Amino acid sequence: TVRFYSFDEFENKIKATGADFVSCNAFLGELTEKEETGLKNVSTTEMTIQDIRITLSMDAFLDEEFKTFQPDVVYADSVCFWGKLNAWKHNVPLVVSTSTFAFNQMASQYMKNSPKELADMVFGLPKISKELKMLKPYGYKVKNALSLVQSDNKTDSVVYTSERFQPYSESFSDHYVFVGPSVFSKIE
């Protein structure tokens, strides 16, 4: 059985694959206007903080799910931190799905950040670190903020780009499979 934990807007597409759909909408917190604006502007800091808060909101629910369902593997999107965090917490093998490019120290060298993005990262890290500390009493094992976003060479990862297009693809271990983009022809 494949269980897919996601949000209601994806329910029909998930069910169409034959997977069981589990709604996570009830765990979305109320956002302040400032937080919502931060997310709309794709602030990495705000996105990470909200994902950590969703993890805490889902904690009791997912603890029970792991006890009763007992998954063999967690397949989580690279920016779905609650998926990663719960795989680590419950000692379940993790496979990371990366829809664009995989990022490690080598690959991140090609990225050009705007001054605004750099400021968000520099000033955001202390905020993220503060939020991460809130996870420890609940049994979550996380080293630091970078361990959430950066790819490591030990975690099995599916990357939806071609190895030829992946920057510094040679720096990734055999735990990575580059499957190319998912392109579908439009049905008329």
Regions found by a protein language model. Name each.
Residues Y5-E188:
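Nucleotide-sugar-dependent glycosyltransferase catalytic domains
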Residues V2:
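Short beta-strand element of Class I
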